[in-house]
Every structure is written in C-alpha cells, then in structure tokens.
Amino acid sequence: MSNNVVVLGTQWGDEGKGKIVDLLTERAKYVVRYQGGHNAGHTLVIDGEKTVLHLIPSGILRENVVSIIANGVVLSPEALMKEMTQLEERGIPVRSRLLLSEACPLILPYHIALDNAREKARGEKAIGTTGRGIGPAYEDKVARRGLRVGDLFDKKAFAQKLKEIIEYHNFQLVNYYKVEPVDYQKTLDDIMAIADILTGMVVDVSDLLYKATQKGELVMFEGAQGTLLDIDHGTYPYVTSSNTTAGGVATGSGLGPRYVGYVLGIIKAYSTRVGAGPFPTELFDETGDFLREKGQEFGATTGRSRRTGWLDIIAIRRAVQINSLSGFCMTKLDVLDGLKEVKVCVGYRLPNGEVIETTPLAADDWEGIEPIYESMPGWNESTFGVKDKAQLPQAALNYIKRVEELTGVPVDIVSTGPDRSETIILRHPFDA
C-alpha cells in the first residue's frame, strides 16, 4: 500500500478540485492528470492572484513539483501552448516542470469541427459539450486511428497519417454535416511548428511513476470533471468521454491500483451542473439564484451559467461506492451562510410512488424522479475564511456531521474560501 493520493470530483464537476490539489501538492513530488482534456477548468487563488488551468496539472505553480499529463488525457497542442505561454509570461518555468506521455491522443482541428457540427445537429437534444473536440478525439483513440504525441517523432510518417485521417473526417463533415472541410496543410504546418517542443517533454510516464513510488516519492493524481459525468457510471449519455472515477487512475497513468493509498472526494456543500442531463435537486427559485450568484457558479472553461440545487446524498453515495472514497473535502461551505434552512436529498420518489435510495444508471430512468429532502437549520454567522473547525457555527458543524452520517465517509478537509490558506485540514490525506 502506498501513500499516493487521488483527488476527484464526486458530483457533476466544478467541485473545487484545483484549489485542493494545489494545496496538497506541498507534500507531493508529482502531480498527474490522468483523464479528460482542456474541457476541465481548475481555478486556483494564491495570495489573491487567480489562475485558471484547463490542461496543465494544478501542481505547476509549485517549484519542486513535477507535473505530468499522462496517457489517459487527450491533448490539444494549441491549448497546451496557449496555457504554457500564459504561465511563462508570469515567470513560471513550465517546460522544466511539465512532462508528457507519448501515448496521449492529440486533439486536432477536425475533432473540434466534428464536436461542434454534432452538437448543432442534435438541436434541443444537445449534450452540452464544451465544443473542444474531447469526445471525437477519444473516438479516434478507441477506433485505433488517432494520432498521438509519440507520432511526432517521425514527422514524415505523421504527415501521411494526418492526410489520411483528415480525408476520412472531411468526408463526414462535408457530406453529412454540410460544413467546411478542415485544411490539411494548415493543420500540418501548425502542429509541425511545435512538434519539437512537445516531443522534448516526453517521458515513459508509467516507468517514471513506478520508480518514484519505489523510492517513496509521493504522487497526487488530479481528476477532472466529476464522478456523475463518468462515461460508464455517469448519467449516460449526458456524460464526458473518459473515466472520471478512481478506476481511471491506473488505466490513465500506467501505475497500478495498489499504489493508491487514499482517494479524496471533493464534495461541494450544494450541487451544480453545467449543460443538459438529470439533476433531481435543481432549484428554479430564489434560493437557486442565491447559490448561483454567491457561489459565482459560472464555468471556468465555457463561462456558462451553472444549474444549482441542494446537496444530493443519493448521488454522493454512488460516488462513494464507485471510488472507494477515503474521505471528503467539503468546498464552498461559506456559500450556504445566511440561509435560514439547508436541505439534503436523502431519497428519490419514482413516478409510481416507489422510494429508492440509489441512482439510476441511464438518463432516461431519472425521468420524473422527485427528491425527498431532510431539512436542517441554517446559520447566519460567516464561515468565509475560517481556518479552525472550532470557529465554525454549530449549525454548520451539524451539517457537516450529517453528511458524514448519511454517507459513511469522514469530512477530512473543509474549504471556506478560494485561497489555499482558507482551508481547515482535519486529517491530511498523505498522513491517513
């Protein structure tokens, strides 16, 4: 058993993972992204300065931490270079801190074109993707036709492979979706201009991480999105295209599951969701507006307004089961300050009157579900910026305790603000 830690979302993403990863990397040697792509949006606030990362791991701001983009991530060269440039302009030496797996599938312009064309064609049934080509890139990976970072080592062979795959996708874009084709030469020129930069950061990630664990060096795995968006276990088809759950760590990084010792589930004190899909506890009243405005619930990646609602314990329990959670970090507790009453969903009532305490698997099976709530007194005192559990209002402590009782998982960390210092650590994941 290793002391390595996984940090992942337990809801529909946007739980506040970036801040917690940044906070905990003080103890880590490596921080690894193992799934997703630049559809993630991890916001960090350090000494009042805000940083939003979409692709590069949140550990990049730490001087002695090595950040790794592993094989489970679909990599947009354009997005990576943009993010690297922004960080380097702030004096952060990204190229000496960042490593890539040669097995990362590349996101190229035809993936983005397909993503947007499909969403437009779906009309009202659109999934609500970020339009960044994530799904189509994973499709090419599974179909074994995708280009990977490692293909850039042989530029002549890459050019031929690119020509063939662009012809394949352009046929669909032009003849089915009736949109403009992707330009082969421009795509080739753009990727060749940065090919040496990408290949210069390539390492054997699986071997590196294995040797690191043998030396006792600590690794943190940074999840993107959330458990309920998992391609297999989420509200299908309103899901992302990767395994956002703890099982994705081994396949997405090449390090075996025995080398994970603690799984930290990030749980927002209420629920949010971006885009379409089931959301039983969604609020359409002034309380929902209150949570959205006070919580600044607007996507870091898309800027879209997030749907808001009460904490859904039934959905959280599913995340506990799937991920073997060791503990929770509860974020945005301060957003609930000032509410006279707070609620948590403890059951679902089906249209036929039956009450269930587990989440359905397919999105259609959520149709007509009504949440069953348990109410608790709210609190007027501010929890914002509190750094000591003893200073939290009793009603807030009761809320935390009730979540622990209903899920069977301890709340080991409480986040009371966006800055890394605004945190109460009750049990450190690396010491658990």
From Swiss-Prot:
E.C. number(s) listed in UniProt: 6.3.4.4
PROSITE patterns, alphabetized: ADENYLOSUCCIN_SYN_1, ADENYLOSUCCIN_SYN_2
GO MF terms held by the record: adenylosuccinate synthase activity; GTP binding; magnesium ion binding
Residues at which IMP binds: D14, E15, G16, K17, N39, A40, G41, H42, T130, R144, Q225, T240, R304
Residue positions of the active site: D14, H42
Record bears the keyword NADP: no
Binding site for Mg(2+): D14, G41
UniProt superkingdom: Bacteria
Annotated substrate binding sites: A300, T301, T302, G303, R304, S305, R306
Family designation: Belongs to the adenylosuccinate synthetase family.
Subunit structure and binding partners: Homodimer.
Descriptive protein name: Adenylosuccinate synthetase
Species of the source: Proteus mirabilis (strain HI4320)
